[in-house]
Each structure stands twice: as structure tokens, then as C-alpha cells.
């Protein structure tokens, strides 16, 4: 016969488990809006923590002044590109607005449409009918798509608002993390040690190294390439160079490099008979591309003694899997997995493996 106490214990266990799951799910829903901002703040603070300590030392040990200085730097780093982007979009849209608002819109005749086999004449006749109707027929044709266009702009406005919210949260969390960095670091290490007394602290150290390697080897390299490319575009007279600069940053972050933006700019210069500037920009583009292969491994080695290929693989995979925040998540996960496998093969802890690697690198 089953003991009633065992039944009570089982019931209590099930109810406790349900309660814990419910509390955990509710807590996740509460903190979900803040996760992205906190994640970005964590990555930024980890990457720039040595810079903050140097600034604090330079300012005579005043943490508050150093934290304010770092927040101002972050504001400039994020706001200046946004201002450039908005300015470029405004400059691009002004001619279109004037064109649409003018009363004498002149559409091209598109006579070449008649030369298209089979369907060319029919398309040309339909196009001429639209032009002859003074725009009324054209409006009726595009009216079904107006709802989708409006919905698209509403979604983009919502995304813009979310971006500003996450940017504000990122700055607030960065301020808190800079101010209480040591306490938070000790708490994370204690938590990691509770999970694994053998490898906990070493895994935290690996995560920090991976984040700094990405920040230096990928992000800093992308910014340097974008600035150099922007200088070349500005001097050669390519329009909307600020917008192209921002596109180059994203292209470099996803490991495509600056050439997908620079090569079309070179072609545009040649197309407009600016052969001298086109040739100079082509030479400058090759220089910037070669510089990428020199700076990236160098900066990754400064950030940590980790395999360059593993970092870059983590960056690309993380971006595809998690979006922009995956830029840091991917390398961290791959580096930890790599070190766990290597330490398991050699039968030593990650901490011992890291010590041996550090000693070898110092002796070399």
C-alpha cells in the first residue's frame, strides 16, 4: 500500500514545479522588452571596460566622471551615424518630393517597349492609355497597393520607435554596468563557479575574450574601413557618400567587406566619364580591401589569443541566426565549445589549458 506521505510529497513536488515554471515564464515576459537593450549594453561595456578604467585612472580615480565620459562617447558613436543617415535620406528624398509635387509631371514615352517580342505592343498601348488619362487611370491601378505601402511605412515608424527605445535602454544599462562593473563581474563569476567549480570562471574569461576580440577585430576594423572608404568617396565626388559609408559598415560587419559598395561607385565614375577619379578610387578600394586582411587578424590577436577563423565563423553564423546581437553571441558560443572540446581531449580543465596557452604565447 502506498504511503499517503509519498502522495503528498509527489503532489507538493508537482505543484512546486508548476509554480516555478509559471513564475519563470511570467518573469521572462516582464523582462523581455529589456533583454535586447541589456544584451547590447553588456557587450559594449565588456568591450570598452579597459578603456573606461584607463579614463578613470587619467581622471584621478573618479568613477562618476569616467562613466559620464564613456556615455558621451557612446552617444556620439551612435547619434552621429544616425544624423548622417537621416541627412542623406532627406537630401535624397527632396528631389523626389519636388518632382511629385510639381504640376507638370513629364513621364517618359518608353517607345522601346514596342520592340519587346510578343507582349511589347500591348504593354506600350496600356502605358499610353495611362498617360492619356491624366493620371486618373494610374491612380486606380495603384490604389490596391496604397494600403500595403501605408502599412509598410507604419511598420517602419514602429521599428524606428523601437530602435530609439532600445538605444535609450542600452545607454541606461551601460551607465549602470559601468558604475557597478566589479560587483556584477564577481556575481557572474560566483554563479558560473556554482554551475561548474572546475571550468566556471574560465568560461566567463573566455566569453569576455571573445567579445573583446569581436569588438576589436570586427567592429573596429569595419569602422576604420568605412571611414577610409568614405574619404575616398568624398574626394572622388561620389554623391550620397555618407549613406554609402553606413552601408559599408554593415557590409564589413557581415564580412562582405567594402568592395560591394565601392566597386559600383567606381563603375558609376567611369560611366560618367570621370576616368581619373574612377581609377584613383579603384586603387584606394584595393588598398582598403587589403588593409582589412591585415587589421582584422591583428586586432583579434590584441583582444584575445583565440583562433581567427573561429571568431569570423561565429560572427557570420551568429548574424544569420540571431541578427545583429549574434555578432557577439556566435563567437562566444563557438569559442566556449571549442575550448571545452580541446580540454576534454587533453583531459585538463579549461583554466589549465588557458594558463598553458598564455605561458606559450609569452615565451614566444
Swiss-Prot record:
Any one GO cellular component localisation term in the record: plasma membrane
InterPro entries (UniProt xref): AI-2E-like
Location (main, coarse): membrane
Keyword Ribonucleoprotein annotated: no
Membrane topology: Multi-pass membrane protein
Transmembrane residue ranges: 18-38, 40-60, 65-85, 161-181, 215-235, 243-263, 280-300, 309-329, 331-351
Keyword flag Ribonucleoprotein: no
Coiled-coil regions listed in the entry: none
Compartment annotation: Cell membrane
Classification via PANTHER family: TRANSMEMBRANE PROTEIN, TRANSPORT PROTEIN YDIK-RELATED
Family: Belongs to the autoinducer-2 exporter (AI-2E) (TC 2.A.86) family.
Record's protein name: Putative transport protein BUsg_115
Amino acid at each position: 500500500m502506498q504511503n499517503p506521505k509519498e502522495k503528498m510529497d509527489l503532489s507538493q513536488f508537482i505543484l512546486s514545479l508548476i509554480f516555478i515554471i509559471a513564475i519563470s515564464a511570467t518573469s521572462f515576459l516582464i523582462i523581455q522588452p529589456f533583454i535586447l537593450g541589456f544584451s547590447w549594453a553588456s557587450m559594449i561595456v565588456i568591450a570598452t571596460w579597459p578603456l573606461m578604467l584607463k579614463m578613470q585612472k587619467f581622471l584621478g580615480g573618479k568613477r562618476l566622471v569616467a562613466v559620464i565620459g564613456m556615455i558621451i562617447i557612446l552617444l556620439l558613436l551612435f547619434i552621429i551615424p544616425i544624423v548622417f543617415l537621416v541627412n542623406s535620406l532627406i537630401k535624397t528624398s527632396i528631389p523626389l518630393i519636388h518632382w511629385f509635387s510639381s504640376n507638370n509631371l513629364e513621364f517618359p514615352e518608353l517607345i522601346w517597349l514596342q520592340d519587346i517580342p510578343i507582349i511589347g505592343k500591348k504593354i506600350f498601348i496600356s502605358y499610353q492609355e495611362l498617360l492619356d488619362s491624366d493620371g486618373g487611370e494610374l491612380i486606380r491601378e495603384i490604389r490596391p497597393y496604397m494600403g500595403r505601402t501605408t502599412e509598410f511605412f507604419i511598420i517602419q515608424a514602429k521599428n524606428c520607435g523601437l530602435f530609439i527605445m532600445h538605444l535609450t535602454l542600452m545607454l541606461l544599462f551601460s551607465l549602470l554596468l559601468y558604475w557597478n562593473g566589479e560587483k556584477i563581474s564577481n556575481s557572474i563569476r560566483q554563479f558560473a563557479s556554482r554551475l561548474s567549480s572546475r571550468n566556471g570562471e574560465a568560461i566567463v574569461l573566455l566569453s569576455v575574450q571573445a567579445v573583446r576580440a569581436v569588438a576589436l577585430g570586427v567592429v573596429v576594423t569595419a569602422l576604420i574601413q568605412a571611414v577610409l572608404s568614405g574619404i575616398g568617396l568624398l574626394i572622388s565626388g561620389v554623391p550620397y557618400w555618407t549613406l554609402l559609408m553606413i552601408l559599408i559598415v554593415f557590409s564589413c560587419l557581415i564580412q562582405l567587406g567594402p568592395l560591394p559598395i565601392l566597386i559600383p561607385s567606381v563603375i558609376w565614375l567611369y560611366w560618367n566619364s570621370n576616368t581619373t577619379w574612377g581609377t584613383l578610387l579603384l586603387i584606394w578600394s584595393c588598398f582598403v580591401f587589403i588593409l582589412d586582411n591585415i587589421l582584422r587578424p591583428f586586432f583579434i590577436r590584441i583582444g584575445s589569443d583565440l583562433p581567427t577563423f573561429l571568431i569570423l565563423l561565429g560572427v557570420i553564423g551568429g548574424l544569420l541566426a540571431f541578427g545583429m546581437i549574434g555578432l557577439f553571441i556566435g563567437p562566444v558560443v563557438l569559442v566556449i565549445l571549442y575550448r571545452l572540446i580541446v580540454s576534454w581531449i587533453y583531459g585538463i580543465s579549461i583554466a589549465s589549458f588557458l594558463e598553458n596557452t598564455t605561458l606559450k604565447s609569452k615565451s614566444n
